[in-house]
């Protein structure tokens, strides 16, 4: 990375620049989150009387015996109903605070949204720890989730992370920087998920099962909060957009990927003497941002629905996973962060940004369709492998939008995007859980088939963006219609 933080002397600059890195906060937070997510699922499963499920799941990766009937179905419905309410609380409570935190971050201090959201993360992890330690009812977790949401939740945290990542990088390098943050998030989530099942089994045979797992989650969340408060520094804004573009041209392949979404860029690249830029003509920024929003929301519907149903799917026949297998399955999901990062580095050398977005959508849609027909554990991992580029669309859309807005509006716009995704995700979670309850005895893969359809449907607005992009490159600029 280039020297984006200025200091009084050359010796002090590298040290100051290291303190502007958001990656340690992202890594610690994601380890805490992956431990928490696995712990939440396993604790809730145990709370709803998982006596029938754990032993059979430990014996094999799939059930070879007769169906376990009503008790398993009742447990699945109880877990599903818990997550319906839980996801509603997690999704709706940030609406009261996340936008305000984004506004404060833009006008007061960039760390406000991150620090307040991390405080909420810590409180929710402490809530799960107390539930395990004191054997409280599962309804306590709704209150812990509400505290997390009132502090901004993931919407405020991730918007703050994206704002700091965008602010501290030049426009040319921003695409790779944001995907690198996602890579760190994926690696941390992979490590946490791999360890989660083993940590959960450290205290077994009584209500304290999961104590070690939840304590580790609280420790990581505490570290992230203290680091963001005491160590993290806000990076100084990178050079002006024009200079950043010039500097970025020296980075082979990866730089020009997202830049063509900016209508002004087509003016800069137009052949001299052919359609010179006209300052009086309006540029269709709002249209493109709206299309990107639409594509992101429809695609996120597919992703959220799949992610919400998958934990229930792997606990039930035909897979019937145990605690360790659940952790491994979650870890497999985090490898998508790694493969998507590598995909951006490779595809950006030969494809436009819209093409990369569509590749990611096809990857996820195909994997979700395969997931609908999974009968064995190895088939599950094959389906997950097909989803290897599933992260590219949302990350690329965020990067593209950052090129179309002013730096002073990063926090606000990213919060609006994240809240839109969160709000639609809440509705999706409720609908998908209800669909799963109705169809799990007839065709358990119904939700995955629906996600596949939505993923391919999301390609349409991105295709329109690609068409408009081709018009810019051909004619130099266009009028807003």
Swiss-Prot record:
Tissue expr: Highly expressed by the epididymal duct epithelium.
Region (Disordered): 263-282
Transmembrane residue ranges: 38-58, 84-104, 114-134, 144-164, 180-200, 211-231, 287-307, 327-347, 354-374, 377-397, 413-433, 447-467
Membrane topology: Multi-pass membrane protein
Post-translational modification: Glycosylated.
Cytoplasmic topological domain: 1-37, 105-113, 165-179, 232-286, 348-353, 398-412, 468-481
Glycosylation sites: 61
Subcellular location: Endosome membrane; Cell membrane
Pfam families listed in its UniProt record: MFS_1
GO biological process: cyclic-GMP-AMP transmembrane import across plasma membrane; negative regulation of T cell apoptotic process; positive regulation of nucleotide-binding oligomerization domain containing 1 signaling pathway; regulation of T cell differentiation; T cell homeostasis; thymus development; transmembrane transport
Role summary: Proton-coupled transporter that delivers pathogen-associated or danger-associated molecular patterns to cytosolic pattern recognition receptors as part of the innate immune response to microbes or tissue injury. Has selectivity toward muropeptides that contain the amino acid diaminopimelic acid (DAP-type peptidoglycan muropeptides) including Tri-DAP and tracheal toxin (TCT), common in Gram-negative bacteria and Gram-positive bacilli.
Family designation: Belongs to the major facilitator superfamily. SLC46A family.
Name of the protein described by the UniProt record: Solute carrier family 46 member 2
Organism listed in the record: Canis lupus familiaris
Gene that encodes the chain: SLC46A2
């Amino acid at each position: 990375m280039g020297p984006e933080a200025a200091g009084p002397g050359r010796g002090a600059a590298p040290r100051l620049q290291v303190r502007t890195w958001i990656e340690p906060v992202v890594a610690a937070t994601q380890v805490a989150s992956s431990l928490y997510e696995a712990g939440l699922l396993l604790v809730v499963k145990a709370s709803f009387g998982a006596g029938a499920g754990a032993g059979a799941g430990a014996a094999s990766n799939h059930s070879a015996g007769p169906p376990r009937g009503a008790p398993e179905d009742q447990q699945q419905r109880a877990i599903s109903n818990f997550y319906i309410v839980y996801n509603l609380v997690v999704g709706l409570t940030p609406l009261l605070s996340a936008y305000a935190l984004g506004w404060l971050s833009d006008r007061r201090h960039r760390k406000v949204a991150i620090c307040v959201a991390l405080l909420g993360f810590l409180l929710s992890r402490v809530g799960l720890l107390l539930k395990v330690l004191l054997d409280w009812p599962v309804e306590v977790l709704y209150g812990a989730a509400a505290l997390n949401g009132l502090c901004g939740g993931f919407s405020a945290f991730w918007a703050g992370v994206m704002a700091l990542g965008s602010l501290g990088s030049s426009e040319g390098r921003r695409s790779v920087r944001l995907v690198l943050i996602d890579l760190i998030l994926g690696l941390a989530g992979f490590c946490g998920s791999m360890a989660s099942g083993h940590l959960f089994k450290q205290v077994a045979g009584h209500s304290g099962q999961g104590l070690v797992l939840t304590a580790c989650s609280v420790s990581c969340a505490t570290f992230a909060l203290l680091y963001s408060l005491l160590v993290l520094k806000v990076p100084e804004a990178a050079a002006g957009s024009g200079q950043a573009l010039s500097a970025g041209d020296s980075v082979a392949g990866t730089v020009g990927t997202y830049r063509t979404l900016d209508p002004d860029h087509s003016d800069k690249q137009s052949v001299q003497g052919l359609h010179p830029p006209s300052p009086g003509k309006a540029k269709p920024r709002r249209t493109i941002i709206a299309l990107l929003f639409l594509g992101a929301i429809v695609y996120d519907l597919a992703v959220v629905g799949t992610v919400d149903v998958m934990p229930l799917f792997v606990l039930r026949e035909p897979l019937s996973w145990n605690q360790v297998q659940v952790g491994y399955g979650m870890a497999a999901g985090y490898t998508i962060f790694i493969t998507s990062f590598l995909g951006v580095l490779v595809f950006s050398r030969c494809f436009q940004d819209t093409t990369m977005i569509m590749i990611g959508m096809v990857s996820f849609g195909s994997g979700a369709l395969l997931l609908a027909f999974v009968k064995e554990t190895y088939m599950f991992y094959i389906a997950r492998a097909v989803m290897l580029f599933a992260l590219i669309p949302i990350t690329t859309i965020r990067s593209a939008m950052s090129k179309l807005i002013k730096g002073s509006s990063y926090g606000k716009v990213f919060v609006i995007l994240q809240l839109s995704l969160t709000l639609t995700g809440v509705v999706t979670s409720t609908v998908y859980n209800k669909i799963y309850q109705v169809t799990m005895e007839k065709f358990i893969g119904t939700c995955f088939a629906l996600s596949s359809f939505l993923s391919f449907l999301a390609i349409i607005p991105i295709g329109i963006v690609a068409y408009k992009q081709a018009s810019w490159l051909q004619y130099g600029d266009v009028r807003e219609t």
